[in-house]
Structures are given as C-alpha cells and as structure tokens.
C-alpha cells in the first residue's frame, strides 16, 4: 500500500510539472501597438506651381503634392479616447498659418508711430449705390441703412528737406483712425500712438487660400474618429488609420466658420469644459452661401515721414471706399441657427448643463472681437452681424424670407490675430472687391453666468477654426516591438551551427497591419510576417513618395522652416527603424519576427487586468486569448526597461558560450587529433606528466626519510654500501684459545652510480604500471557493475511492460462480467500490481545502491593501490 501511494505521488508531481512548465520571454516584431506622440508633421497641398499668388508660392515651397491614392484602414474592436483640447496639432497649425499669413501680407517697413498733433475738420464724401451681380441676392442691395464713416481733412507741419524749415501738409483720415485730444475739439492724433512699432505693407496683397493637409511622417500614423456622436471629447469606437488629414482651408476669420468641412449626418456642437475661454464650436451639415462686396474707386496719396519711409493715406475720395456689406439667404441662415441651437442643447444636456436660448456678441474690446472679421482679396472686412442674430429667436413660428444684409467696414490699421502687434495696410484697392464663401459653422465660447447657465457668445479665437477641424485626429507612434511570455526557450548553441536568416520583404501597405489591433494577441501573432512586411513596406514607400514629391518640385523648393520639417520627418522615420533593429540585434533577434530567449518570464512584470489575473491557473492562456497587443503593452509598459536589460545580458552570456564552444570546435573531428600542429602540445603534456611523477617520487622519498629519521635511523640512501667495522680490542680467533687478529672484511660495491639510477627508474616505472593497472581494473569492475545494473533495470522494465500488458488484457476480458465480479477482480488486480511494482522497485533501489557503492569505493581502491606501490 505504501508503494502504491508513493507511485501515485510521483505521477501527480510529474503531471503538475508538465502542466506548469516554465514560460520564457519572447520578442515579437510587427505587433499592432502604438503610443501617443508629437512628431514633426509635414503638409501636402494641390498647389498650382504656375500661380504667382503668395499662398500658392508658399504651398509649393513648403508642402509636398497630394498622394494620388490616399487610403484609410478601419480598426475593428478598438476604442480610443480623443480630446480636442489636448491636440498638439492645433498649435502646430497655428504657427504654420501664422507664417503663411505673414508671408502673404508681408510688411516690409517698420515705422515709428506717426504721433504728431493735427488740426482736423470733417469733410463730405460722395455716396454711391452698390449693385450686386450675384444670383443669390436681390438685383439691388440698398445700403442706405449702413451709415457712412466720417472723413476728416487734417493739417499738420512736416519737416522739409531743409531741417530748419517746415511746411504744412493736408491729408484725409477716417474718423476711426484718429483720436481727439482731451480738452481740444479740433486737435487729433493717430489712433495707433500707443504702439511702440507698427509695420506697413509695401504692396497690395491678395489671399486666395487653398486647402492643405497635415501628414504624419513614416513610422507614425493618424487615428481618425468616425463616431457620429463624437462632440470633442470621449471614447471613440469607430476608429480608422489615415496618413493625412482632410483638406483644411487656412482661413483667417472670427465668429463664423468659413469654407470648412461639413458633418456627414446632422449638425454637431463640440464642447470640452475648460477653466477659461471654453470653446463652443458648431459644425453644420449644410453650408450657407455668404457673399461680401465692396464697390467704389479711390486714389491714394502719400506722406513722407522720413528718409525712405512713406505713410500712405487717402488723398481724393470717390464714394465711401471703406463701406461694404455681406448678405445671406434669411431662410437658410435661420434654419441653420435652429440646428445649431438644437445641437448645443443636445451636447450640453449630455453634460447636465443648461443653455440660454440666444446668441450674443461681445460688447467691449477690439473691433476684431466685437464684429465678424475676415479677409477678402487682401482687404480686411469688419462686419456687424448683430441684426442677424438678434432677430433670431427659439421656437419662432414665422418663416423669414428674403436676404439678410450686414454692414461692413474696411480698415487700414489692423490688430494681428496671432501675436500682440498691429499692421498698417494700404488703402482699399480700386474697383470692386467681392468674395463668395460657405458658412460651415460657428466659432463661439460658452460664457457662464451667475445662474450656472451657459450663453453662446461669438468668439475671436482664430485657432478654434482648426481646433474643430482637427478634433477627430490623433497622432500616434507605431511601436512594432513587444515582449510576451511563451513556453518556448531559445535552443542551446551547437557546434558548426549556422543561424538561418529570414529576409523581411516588402509587400503590404504600411498601416495595414494596424487593422489587427482589435484582434487578440494569439490571433494577431499569426500574421506577424505580413504585418512586419507591411511596416517596412510603408516606411520605404513613404520615404519614396516624399523623395518623388521633392524631386518633382525641387526647382521651387527652398530650405525654409517647412523644408527643415520635411528633412526632420524623413530622418525621424529612418532613425526609428534603425533603433528598433539595433535593439533586436542586441537581443540576438536580428531579422527575426518571433525570437525566443532564455530569460524566464516573471509574473510581476505585467500588471493585473480586469480580463486576466495572476492568480488564475490559466493566466497565460487568458493573455493570448483575451487581450489585444495594445492592452498587453499597457500592462508591461513599466517593466520594459528591466526586460530589455535582462534580454541584453542573456544575449551577452549566449555570445560567451558560443565563443567557448567555437574554441572546442577544433576537436570535433578525430583527424584533428593527429594534426602535426598539435604535436608540440602533446609533447608539452607528456613532459608535464613525467615531471609530475618524478616530483611525486621525490616527495614520497623525502617523506619516507623524514619518517625514518624520526624513528632514529641515519638518513642514508638504501643502495649505498657501508663497511661493518670491528672493534680492534676484540680477538679474532676461535674459541678455545687466542689467536691472531683477523683482517677486516669489506662488502663488494656495485659496478657504478648509473646502476643506482637504473634501479630507481625501474622501480618508478613498475610503480606507475601497477598504479595504472589498478586504476583500469577498478574502472573495469565499475563498468561491469554498471552494465549489470543496466541489464537488471532493462529486464525489470521488460517484465513490468509485459505484466502491464497482461493486466490490461485481463481487465479487457473481465469488463464483460457483472458489476460485482468486476469490482472484486479490479481490487485484486490493483493489489497484485502494487505487490509486483514494489518488487521491481526494490530491485532498482538495490541496483542504484550497488552502483553508488562501487563509485564510492573508487578512491579507496586507488589509495590501496598507492599503498601497495609505495610499500
């Protein structure tokens, strides 16, 4: 019974050992994993290289051509969090559009403020009726309701070419450009005297924006949220991967979202609650046609204010050159405002917020803030849209038809929208200035009142235009390198082993392998080859596209800020790929997609997740069947440094083992043992052995002499003869009488000293022979005992095997009996099997004991042989 229990325990331990085998760290290359990043983006545009428009010139100098075959890959079973307030692309686009704006409206002169006292009187201007040629408006637009700006004729003294003389100059200024001196009715100054430096435009500019796209460099990608209910922040479950954004117009405007993209389904309100200036951005699903126009002619004069510096002003006025208007269809405008308020209510109610059912304008501040400000053909329009919004009410019953007209003014002194500065631009151009745009949304902020209620208020934050356009995008860095536990271990290095190299070819699209991001780790790892090929293919393809685009327009490219960005994007991709390959090489995984290692996996390296827990018996199976690579990467993110270090140490040890193995590889062939280059080595070994034996003999002789000296003997060599001297006083005769003294007898000496040396060498060789003979005899006895043990073990195994077969056959035959008989026979068979197993187990134990005793007696036999040889 005890034997049966022991066998059962052994079987259980064996089964458990098989079930809980060791897992090792395995490196995977080509897994669908990404992390948020902020790389240098580059732009693409469909610019006309033949156009001399400054915006087209800027685009051809700084942007690559559009990809003729843009692609988009949908990620299944993936949910990602988006937040438009944390999108760094908005700030980057603001800086780029600021550069574009300054290049298009390039000021070439910095002027000291024209701050001299002027005596001004109001003058009359000739009014003119404006006719509209658009089909969306009525044939004639009556602008009598739009007040004319007052024009003042101002006189001041100016220094002539002779510094000690002055002359009086007359110039015309708009009332909005001058400010009255306190306490004096006729004394005025220019309005910009509180600015230290102003810039003035040299030539009249035009600005016809074309859409540009922002693209991620190779090794990076753009995630795009396609959820229809996304409103600026939250989880997005419908995600796709793109290389570039959609075309975004570099519009510079406040309050209204012009020429942007439209929502696919219904109007949406984007809102992310922040501490200050909370943006409330509305995007329509149907655009509104907007027409803005200014007609009239004028001539311009100039005032010389210093060497090479000229201040342009109005000399002769024909009509009001700053008077303009914008018009929309009333029905379309009010309908879209209804949709906008409904979208705002939906978004705010989802956040448990209340909204005032009205649209407001800021009452105080710069004119760019209190009015609708935009640029049309190089002219800056300031439009008052209060009558468009104040006439709208929620839940109104009457439908308004016709055309809504808003009064606008053109200004010459403009506040910069991106930085704190001002610019003085040339007076309005001659002829008609007319623009057609599409209103695609509203740019507002949510102002909170004392009742914790929000009021939509039109905003002058220009970058909010790009914020809503880029709200659905996120830049990520693709990280195809990951580690995970697998039961496989890196095999040991063998001699003459050549590592097979697998070429990673170019095949699929770059971002296509991210389509497996929603699959489990086990399912995604099956397609690692295709995914890694897609990764490398995409890097190479994107670099090739970039080079082709640069070569196509290299005669126009200049190494500007954007030119440097293009080079940075290219170098970033190459450096990223080289970095991954260097890590793989350090771990001994170069050119491998799945690389096993000898580093045991530690459970503490991965954090617990809601899907898989460390205490689960099937933890590793849970990882591969339930987690995605993206989820797994987040669990091991904090331990990657430790894992990478251990992988590098393991590879270093592997290289050392390989070096030692290569040193032994020269003995792998039997013929190499007879190589003539090894003979000197053999002779050296023989000399060492002989010297060791001689030294051992000398040492034993010294020990023997010391032993005899301690017993009182004279230390003489055993082979040197000595004469036995006789006492001279002792008679040498025989008994019975005295006789004469006998002569002293000498023992004959050996033939010579070499005989003594020969005798020692003979004894030494005999001792060596006897020692080796004893050793070989002991080894032979041990091998015989081991052979007998193996034979006995094999015989026992055969008997056990036959007995088991017989028992199985008996069990099969007995299975046809009744239940009671089967129970009795089964118990008997188990008892018999237990008794028999105990018998051969004892035999094995006895054999092992016999072998162990033989091995243990080997030193004793050697010692006995040495004693026999030395004595």
Swiss-Prot record:
Ranges for region V3: 292-325
Coiled-coil intervals, chain numbering: 645-668
Region (V1): 120-153
Alphabetically ordered keywords of this record: Apoptosis, Cleavage on pair of basic residues, Coiled coil, Disulfide bond, Fusion of virus membrane with host membrane, Glycoprotein, Host cell membrane, Host endosome, Host membrane, Host-virus interaction, Membrane, Signal, Transmembrane, Transmembrane helix, Viral attachment to host cell, Viral envelope protein, Viral penetration into host cytoplasm, Virion, Virus entry into host cell
GO molecular function list: structural molecule activity
Disulfide bridge partners, by residue number: 43-63, 108-202, 115-193, 120-154, 215-244, 225-236, 292-326, 376-435, 383-408
Stretch list, region MPER: 663-684
Region (V5): 451-458
Entry text on domains: Some of the most genetically diverse regions of the viral genome are present in Env. They are called variable regions 1 through 5 (V1 through V5). The 17 amino acids long immunosuppressive region is present in many retroviral envelope proteins. Synthetic peptides derived from this relatively conserved sequence inhibit immune function in vitro and in vivo.
Protein name per UniProt: Envelope glycoprotein gp160
Originating species: Simian immunodeficiency virus (isolate TAN1) (SIV-cpz)
């Amino acid at each position: 019974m005890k034997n049966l229990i022991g066998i059962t325990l052994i079987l259980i331990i064996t089964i458990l050992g098989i079930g809980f085998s060791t897992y090792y760290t395995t490196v995977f290359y080509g897994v669908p994993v990404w992390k948020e990043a902020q790389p240098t983006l580059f732009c693409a545009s469909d610019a006309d290289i033949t156009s001399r428009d400054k915006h087209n010139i800027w685009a051809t100098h700084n942007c690559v051509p559009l990809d003729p075959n843009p692609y988009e890959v949908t990620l299944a079973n993936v949910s990602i969090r988006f937040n438009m307030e944390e999108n760094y692309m908005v700030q980057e686009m603001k800086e780029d559009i600021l550069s574009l704006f300054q290049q298009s409206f390039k000021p070439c002169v910095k002027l000291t403020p024209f701050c001299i006292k002027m005596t001004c009187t109001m003058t009359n201007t000739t009014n003119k009726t404006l006719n509209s040629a658009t089909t969306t408006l009525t044939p004639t637009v009556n602008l009598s309701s739009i007040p004319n700006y007052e024009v003042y004729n101002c006189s001041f003294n100016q220094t002539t070419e002779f510094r000690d003389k002055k002359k009086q100059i007359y110039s015309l200024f708009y009332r909005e450009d001058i400010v009255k001196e306190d306490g004096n009715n006729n004394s005025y100054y220019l309005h910009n005297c509180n600015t230290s430096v102003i810039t003035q435009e040299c030539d009249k500019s035009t600005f016809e924006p074309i859409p540009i796209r922002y693209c991620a460099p190779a090794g990076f990608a753009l995630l795009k949220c396609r959820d229809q209910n996304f409103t600026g922040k939250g989880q997005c479950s419908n995600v796709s991967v793109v290389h570039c954004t959609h075309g975004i117009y570099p519009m510079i405007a406040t309050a209204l979202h012009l020429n942007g993209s439209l929502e696919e389904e219904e109007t949406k309100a984007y809102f992310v609650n922040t501490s200050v200036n909370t943006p409330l951005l509305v995007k329509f699903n149907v655009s509104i046609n907007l027409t803005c126009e200014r007609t009239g002619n004028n001539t311009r004069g100039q005032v010389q204010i210093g060497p090479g510096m000229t201040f342009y002003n109005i000399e002769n006025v024909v009509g009001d050159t700053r008077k303009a208007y914008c018009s929309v269809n009333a029905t379309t405008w009010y309908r879209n405002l209804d949709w906008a308020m409904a979208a705002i209510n939906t978004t705010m109610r989802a956040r448990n917020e209340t909204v005032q059912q009205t649209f407001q304008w800021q009452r105080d501040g710069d004119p760019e803030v209190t009015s609708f400000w935009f640029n049309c053909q190089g002219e800056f329009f300031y439009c008052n849209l209060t009558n468009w919004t104040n006439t709208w009410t929620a839940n109104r019953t009457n439908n308004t038809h016709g055309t809504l007209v808003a009064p606008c003014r053109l200004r010459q002194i403009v506040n910069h929208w991106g930085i704190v500065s001002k610019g003085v631009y040339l007076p309005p151009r001659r002829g008609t200035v007319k623009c057609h745009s599409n209103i695609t949304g509203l740019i507002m902020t949510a102002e909170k009142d004392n009742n914790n209620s929000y009021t939509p208020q039109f905003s002058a934050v220009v970058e909010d235009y790009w914020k809503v356009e880029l709200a659905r995008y996120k830049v990520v860095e693709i990280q195809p390198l990951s580690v995970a536990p697998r039961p496989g271990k890196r095999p040991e290095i063998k001699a003459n082993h050549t590592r097979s190299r697998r070429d990673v070819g170019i095949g699929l699209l770059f971002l296509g392998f991210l389509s497996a991001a929603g699959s489990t780790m086990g399912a995604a790892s099956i397609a690692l080859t295709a995914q890694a090929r897609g990764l490398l293919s995409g890097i190479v393809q994107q670099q090739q596209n970039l080079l082709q685009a640069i070569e196509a327009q290299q005669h126009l490219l200049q190494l500007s800020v954007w030119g440097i960005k293009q080079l940075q994007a290219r170098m970033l991709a190459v450096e990223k790929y080289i970095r991954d390959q260097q890590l793989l090489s350090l771990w001994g995984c170069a050119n491998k997609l799945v690389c096993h290692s000898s580093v045991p996996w530690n459970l503490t390296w991965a954090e617990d997740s809601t899907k898989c827990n460390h205490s689960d018996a099937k933890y590793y199976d849970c990882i591969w069947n339930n987690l995605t690579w993206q989820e797994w990467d987040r669990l091991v993110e904090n331990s990657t440094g430790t894992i990478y270090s251990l992988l590098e140490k393991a590879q270093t040890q592997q290289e050392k083992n390989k070096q030692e193995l290569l040193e032994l590889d020269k003995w792998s062939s039997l013929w190499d043992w007879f190589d003539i280059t090894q003979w000197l080595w053999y002779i050296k070994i023989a000399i060492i052995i002989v010297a060791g034996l001689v030294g051992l003999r000398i040492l034993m002789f010294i020990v023997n002499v010391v032993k005899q000296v301690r017993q009182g003997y004279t230390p003489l060599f055993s082979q040197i003869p000595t004469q036995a001297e006789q006492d001279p006083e002792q008679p040498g005769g025989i008994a019975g009488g005295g006789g004469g003294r006998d002569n002293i007898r000498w023992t004959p000496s050996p033939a010579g000293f070499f005989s003594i040396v020969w005798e020692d060498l003979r004894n030494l060789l005999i001792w060596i022979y006897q020692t080796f003979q004893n050793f070989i005899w002991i080894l032979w006895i041990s091998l015989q005992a081991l052979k007998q043990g193996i034979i006995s073990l094999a015989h026992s195994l055969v008997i056990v095997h036959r007995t088991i077969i017989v028992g199985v056959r008996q069990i099969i035959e007995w299975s046809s009996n009744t239940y009671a008989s089967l129970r009795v026979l089964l118990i008997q068979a188990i008892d018999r099997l237990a008794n028999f197993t105990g018998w051969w187990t004892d035999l094995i134990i006895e054999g092992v004991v016999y072998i162990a005793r033989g091995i243990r007696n080997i030193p004793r036999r050697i010692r006995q042989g040495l004693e026999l040889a030395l004595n």
